[in-house]
Amino acid sequence: RPGTEYLGEVKNSSNVTRLIPFEFKTSDTYALEFGNQYMRVFRNGLQVLSATKTISAITKANPGVLTSNSHGYSNGDEVYLENSGAMAELKSRNYLVAGSSTNTFTLTDLYGVAINTTSFTTFDSGVTTAKIYEVATPYTSAQVNDVRFAQSADVMYIVHPSHAIRTLSRTDHNAWSFATPSITENNTPVLTTSDNYPSVVTFFEQRLVFAATNNNPQTLWFSKNADYLNFTTGTADDNALIYTIASNKVNAIRYLSATRILNIGT
């Protein structure tokens, strides 16, 4: 088994957390941390950060008070502090924001212990902070292991039987967004109502393929050729397809694997 590398603490290690790969190309890859209704991003072995804030002052007190005008932080936000200047005792690492006001805040470690700067050397300059980049998701920690996904360039299609189909789009390292796409349908069974959300997804021969809703666990939906959100069926070669497995037992489709053929597992 290949070795692993420690990249950072998850947001809450008491909850189930899952890493999902996102690869635009071999030289541009990410690890996505899915936890309890949030997503964080790792790139090149580091946590992706939001905008950097410059610290203009740090008091010698318990707890030490940091000044950064209009910083925008809230209590409980996790930030990475970079220290390349004085007050060397304040190490470059992750902290939690506490005591937040418009222009000032204090810090605790990740266990909630306040950072006491009383005996630290005097601050001069060289300290910045940046919030750990995070996006809200609909998936709870109890659901993340049942999330399935398929990616095309900068867009990932994500499914879970309890949630509407989502897209996850990337426009920059710290610019990701979830959306509920508009799906065109003209036939039943549908994909866009409660108990009709798919559980499995893949790409196959220029089509986006969904499968296994709660109401139709053995049905597959193939999009129109090269038109991934169009599930309009018809008689043309490139129209969408809806296919239900004929079987003596109604075993739900559990996975789809696209190779030279489409492998379907129950």
What are the residue ranges of the model-derived segments?
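N-terminal beta-propeller domains
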Residues: 1-52, 163, 167-265
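Small/polar beta-strand repeat architecture
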Residues: 46-151, 159-164, 172, 181-193
